[in-house]
Amino acid sequence: IPIVGEIPARKDSEGDDAIVVSDSRNDRISEAFRMLRVDLNFIAKEARVLMFTSTLSGEGKSFVSRNLAVALAISGKKVILLDTDLRKHTQSKLAGVNRKEGLSTYLSGLNSNPDTLITVGAFHPQVDTIFAGIIPPNPAELLMNERFDQLIDELKKRYDYIILDNVPALVVADAAIVSRVTDLTIYVIRDGVLDRRYLPELERLHQDGKFKNMCIVLNDSQVEKKKYGYGYGQGYGYGYGHVNGYYSEKE
């Protein structure tokens, strides 16, 4: 699986809601997103619908997806970010937005006008957003609805890039369902904490071709630790417990 980007560790003061890319910022992390923008264009030049997923929660895919969206936007591209995680609404939480109308209401037929779903400048003035909406009882079934395909087709007419911030691939089926509309899958791995027991599963996803043009972005890269032999694949920080928010108590 190709590794197309490496995002350095953030400052302690910068949370998952941080936007670290701007025209005036030239530090290592901002430059890493610019390089990611270039490298993604190199490996899949025609890709316009980019899906972000991960192994489990806590990898930083929402942070990476929103900052890549900004990196693309400041290069002159029209970009929209969709929160396709109908279970946890991560992008909504990060932006401090509590909209009842969103992707879930559109897919369920409660809303038929895409224009009313789009929020302008929620976390950056040059990036539009469609938030998840109310939490539905049947997220996977909603995402299988052909209305989702129709929405993506409509957005393709308006935007150069459509960024989908999705659920972790090994937690629920939603990511595999959404992948049918994507051109490129960006699999985010947080450096130093991936449990090695997941590596065969990751390779299986790649070999089975469930995710189109699957590639890896290494997030929170610990440069100093790597000098001493640590880093990617070394830790066991997750165990099998990072599924909070994706299953109900009954499940």
Segments predicted by a language model, with ranges:
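Membrane-cytosol interface motif
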Residues: 1-9
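P-loop NTP-binding module
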Residues: 8-11, 18-19, 23-251
